[in-house]
Amino acid sequence: VSYIDDLLRAYARFVSIPWDSSVAGPQRVWMAVYPPEQERRLRLRIGEFANATRQAGHGWHLVDLTDSFGSWLGAHEYRAAYFESPEDLKLALEQFAEELAAHVRTQLTAEHVNESSVVALMGLASLFGVARVSHLIQAVNNDIRGRLLAFFPGELEGTNYRLLGARDGWNYLAVPITASEG
């Protein structure tokens, strides 16, 4: 049995439990925590997470953020200057974070997303060093209708999440889903 098998089993249990509609936005966030080296296996099996969601009677909407920074930078007016002087990019990263939050917010509030939907965020590792996952999730908290599932390649220590094992961690009200619960 693999780590992803156990994570999938734990997720299937979580998604099938009746949802409390009175919880606040931060408590509507589920963090599926897994070791970063399991990323490829998770991506190969993402359809099984979608199936588990649908079998539990909920909608599934996947938002892959993997290419978001590259796409944003490629379309940026000053992209050539940033490649020449990468330190200048630091000032523009706040704009990227705001645009990323707006993109996720649009997905969370799309017409086809309702109180019984799971919106899953994938590709969070690609944000490392350019945007903080904690800030992204906090920026969209109030827009979560059903549940926001964040596939989180990192660690959970108590109630602190650490992206890729680095100190981008934060103490958060999100509900953790780990393979040890499978």
Where are these regions (language model features)?
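N-terminal, charge-rich interaction modules
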Residues: 2-77
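Short, charged beta->alpha transition segments
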Residues: 15-19, 101-110
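Residue-level preference for the first positions of well-ordered beta-strands
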Residues: 28-31, 118, 147-149
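Short acidic, S/G/P-rich loop/turn micro-motifs used as interaction or catalytic elements
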Residues: 36-41, 68-69, 94-99, 125-129, ...
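A short acidic (Asp/Glu
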Residues: 40-46, 72-75, 129-135, 159-163
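Long, charge-dense
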Residues: 59-105
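Conserved P-loop NTPase "ATPase switch" module shared by AAA+ and STAND
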Residues: 114-130
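Glycine-rich, aromatic-bearing surface loops/beta-hairpins
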Residues: 132-182
